[in-house]
Amino acid sequence: MKTLRNQNYWWKFEQLPLLLYLCKWLFLSVLSGACIGSASALLLVSLEWATQYREHHLWIIALLPVAGLLIGLMYHYWAGTASRGNNYLIEEIRSPHDIIPFRMAPLVYIGTVLTHLFGGSAGREGTGVQMGGAIADQFSRLFRMRRRDHRLMVAIGISAGFASVFGTPLAGAVFGLEVIVVGRMRYEAILPSFLSAAVASMVCHAWGVEHTHYVVSEVPFPDASNLLWTIGTGILFGLAAMLFSRSISFWSGMAKRISYPPFRSLIGGLVIAAAVWMMGTTKYIGLGVPTIVASFTEQQMWYDFLLKILFTTFTIGVGFKGGEVTPLFFVGATLGSALSAVVPLPMGLLAGIGFVAVFAGATNTPIACTLMGIELFGAEPGLYLGIACVVAYLFSGHTGIYTAQLIGSPKHLAYSRRKGKTLAE
């Protein structure tokens, strides 16, 4: 009897702090998730309008240099630390110093809408993540949180922003845990990340926003031959991810030769507008969602992925705003579709594998990308997706679109000396 009473006493003593912890983060996750989900809904609706307006008024692409100058001026004179984008969020989670300035959210929103409206090639994930991180961290200031909780709030923002932009709460939650350190997960944020991702995704949907649906119609039995082909294509997807990441660094370095930052996007806008005019197509600017969808049923040209890499990395490198992930989907899906001409796997499956594998290689988040594939395409191709994501992650090397990522576990023993360094070092 005495033992039973002691057990009841210890249950109350040990579980009460956990209950309080759950209530605290449930409140903060619902609050921040609702705000971020609403912000993401506004972003997605705005980008849909910008895309439709541009496609019906193609003359507006000629004004891309003007938009570039406006974006450059905004960021040069008002952004401050917010100009570092996603890398700033990663740095603050790893080594917290300051509250993320709220101005990051409206600046990246305006910059992204202008980029898409006037014909830049960019995505939306980076915008959603930055808006999410900036919005969530304002509650750190409001409630006077400790440094540890400040880190968790930024992680909440990343997860909620990602989940609501793509409608993938599981992938969004894990992405916020996996993206900070290469090869390691940050489990201290697991509860608030999952809660905020779920709430943000639901709120975004409640605003009437519909996400794109993709269909992998045929999934063969995973025999040895099919899995070997998956590994082979995973290598190619990893190399494509490496090319994408290094191209952004290259164009960014080239742009820095122009001493006055606003002129970088001005001149870059001139180049992009001229290239679109000479090619006579808008296929490689904007999000490219129609081409991504078509890749699952129609074989794409072998050079489509290369041109999207060129247009997107140049757009981001010279200072336009937006994410890189949707263009990465384009790169992977079109490359997978083109490979169906020589690889004996269904076109839709190859497009789906490429969709998530290039993303995994460029962001160093193979688990989140595998979950995203399962959320988007269903569980049936899960084994193929997982293998390709891991292989692409390995073969992309220590590169990535987030250069502030810390190498926590090197991808190969030969690179053990890089442990503890960032991708930029």
Q: Where on the chain are the PLM-derived regions?
A:
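Alpha-helical transmembrane segments and immediately membrane-proximal extracytoplasmic
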Residues: 1-425
